[in-house]
Amino acid sequence: MTEQKHEEYGADSIQVLEGLEAVRKRPGMYIGDTQDGSGLHHMVFEVLDNAIDEALAGHCDKITVTIHADHSVSVADNGRGMPTGIHPKEGRSAAEVIMTVLHAGGKFDNNSYKISGGLHGVGVSVVNALSDWVTLTIYRDGKEHFVRFVRGETEEPLKIVGDSDKKGTTVRFLAGTETFGNIEYSFDILAKRIRELSFLNNGVDIELTDERDGKHESFALSGGVAGFVQYMNRKKTPLHEKIFYAFGEKDGMSVECAMQWNDSYQESVQCFTNNIPQRDGGTHLTALRQVMTRTINSYIEANEVAKKAKVETAGDDMREGLTCVLSVKLPDPKFSSQTKDKLVSGEIGPVVNEVINQALTDFLEENPNEAKIITGKIVDAARAREAARKAREITRRKGVMDGLGLPGKLADCQEKDPALSELYLVEGDSAGGSAMQGRDRKFQAILPLKGKILNVEKARFEKMLASQEVATLITALGAGIGKEEFNPEKLRYHRIIIMTDADVDGAHIRTLLLTFFYRQMPELVERGYIYIAQPPLYKAKYGKQERYLKDELEKDQWLLGLALEKAKIVSDGRTIEGAELADTAKQFLLAKTVIEQESRFVDELVLRAMLHASPIDLTSSENADKAVAELSGLLDEKEAALERIEGHEGHRFIKITRKLHGNVMVSYIEPKFLNSKAYQTLTQTAAALKGLVGEGAKLYKGENEYDADSFETALDILMSVAQKGMSIQRYKGLGEMNPEQLWETTMDPAVRRLLKVRIEDAIAADEVFVTLMGDEVEPRRAFIENNALIAQNIDA
């Protein structure tokens, strides 16, 4: 597939089709949604895809992606380097043409790229058009070339800035704030895509670095699509150890596929064309399903497996518990839309059919133990499908499936247009009663749910239908259930709002409902129909004022606002008040939160001392000793002992030993911690506090004067004064609110807060549901331990 990779890739290879004018007017057509973050991350993917195309052509094996502290992103590869010669038609460097002209690129010239991820000549010029600035550094022909663009226009022509024996291209860009509502990148979203690319392109080392918090991950993932399947199944229980793998080429097209069954009831298939994911599958997936059904059925019939089990197997049975990655590569792929979510190239079908048929037949014949396990799983699925069919008929007769008889517990709304209707799923009859009284019955329906609904992660379909609460929910929604029956067009409400108590039981019920929607009605999540209500956690009374506060953070911020009213600190003749006092107080409270979270890993006394110390440097023994001396000087010798430890390969640590209640507590300050966002917060706070408040300082709050020899003392006094005469009530349940309060805080569209449920990484989401709701205890315990620090509002 890369037989033409040695063809000349120069200025003559770049073809120009049209200009950039339309991009800035309608960026969504080219890059996706510019407000929800998807378009922003797609900017990185466009540049990254260019580097991957160099790897596909056999010219690149190292790619580095960096999120910089100024929110710019750079993508560097060690490929051939963009062409730097003068373009014959445009009269300027080919690199400038690629960056400034839409549809200019080597992807339209089959000599330069035989296979590429669609028409990516669009990509990098669109990134340039939608960025405040772009810098392009090219290492080619023993020289380093540089050019800078501002809002899509060349600042000055490409120039040689020095000699270099490197080769490759580095693109760095700052996304335009006029186009994008938010330019905050998610490390996890970028990591998900890079992980896919690493599995799909053996031999390419991709590194992702986040300079904002020092996070770094290297993706040199081996195993190809088989390794990808193993990764997807790592939190599940595979039924057979050996992974099915197939690879074949024909007529310039290639098919690569890996499959492994696990003990779950869900199918998990990832499809790719030229490294681009297809969320909606397409001709390659259709062909795979057909050939898989035909081949496995032939094996089952030949070995009389179904006959002995007295069941008839179908295609759906074969996909229950299947984890599969299918990757096809072909020239000029055709998709159903600009988003490339569905492949429509018909020519790939016969190739998939031929490759999989032979490989799967051989796999089943040569691995009888695996074949027995897989066919046994399929027979079990067929039996369950038959039981589910009978259960479905019973429930249909009861009116559950078709929604003819609405449940008596449902307080429906008057509105008949689903787009204008809301359904609140409320925990308990008490809160349900308050919600029914407080709602706007014109468009708000209420369905109280009694107790905890069935955990569908562990239950087969027929058991789920037998659950009264689940059956009631299915009936109320009106869209049916199951592959044959579910129809989202029949859904009676386009806003389904989960409203539970702010305690552990409420969180559990919310998780059970999310599991139900994710596993049984994922399209409702994809369409953005599922929401989580945000009832307030606190009600504060201060004099005649009454205020509802969403969570701990909002409570602290509100208290801080009251504390700082008419407050000032006078130290060494300098007055600290207004915005300066407020900013410093917020920074200090943030540091306190960090100390609380990080004290699990680093001694709390030492973390507090860091607020009064210089930044710690462990790059040399001398600097590490200085840090030990300074921190020790801020602590009582009886409290903690610090010492420098020399580790492997020049790594240094500071060991902290402290006695507490007769126990010896040991923790470490490591380089990883010093590169974290948490430590950045502590050093920023230390810088803000340095020399701010000294001995003899005075705090004034209104008419009152207090002694305050540190900022922490002053803030403690202010917060204590603010809470005098105030009562703060913590709501444990929705039933504690009367109907008017529930409407005012949680149901009134003018003031309420709703969280929309979205899935950004399907594989990660699948893992979370398997971990939290599955049968395995150890992964769940590990998950809870690892995430305990970031959990909020957990009952003591």
From Swiss-Prot:
Its cofactor is Mg(2+); Mn(2+); Ca(2+). It catalyses: ATP-dependent breakage, passage and rejoining of double-stranded DNA. GO terms for cellular component: chromosome; cytoplasm. Mg(2+) 1 binds at E427, D501. SUPFAM superfamilies: ATPase domain of HSP90 chaperone/DNA topoisomerase II/histidine kinase, Ribosomal protein S5 domain 2-like, Type II DNA topoisomerase. Keywords: ATP-binding, Cytoplasm, DNA-binding, Isomerase, Magnesium, Metal-binding, Nucleotide-binding, Topoisomerase. One of its GO terms (molecular function) is DNA topoisomerase type II (double strand cut, ATP-hydrolyzing) activity. Binds two Mg(2+) per subunit. The magnesium ions form salt bridges with both the protein and the DNA. Can also accept other divalent metal cations, such as Mn(2+) or Ca(2+). It is found in: Cytoplasm. Mg(2+) 2 binds at D501, D503. Residues 421-536 form the Toprim domain. One of its GO terms (biological process) is DNA topological change. Its EC number is 5.6.2.2. It holds the Pfam family Toprim. HAMAP family: GyrB (MF_01898). A type II topoisomerase that negatively supercoils closed circular double-stranded (ds) DNA in an ATP-dependent manner to modulate DNA topology and maintain chromosomes in an underwound state. Negative supercoiling favors strand separation, and DNA replication, transcription, recombination and repair, all of which involve strand separation. Also able to catalyze the interconversion of other topological isomers of dsDNA rings, including catenanes and knotted rings. Type II topoisomerases break and join 2 DNA strands simultaneously in an ATP-dependent manner. NCBIfam families: gyrB, PRK05644.1, PRK14939.1. This is DNA gyrase subunit B.
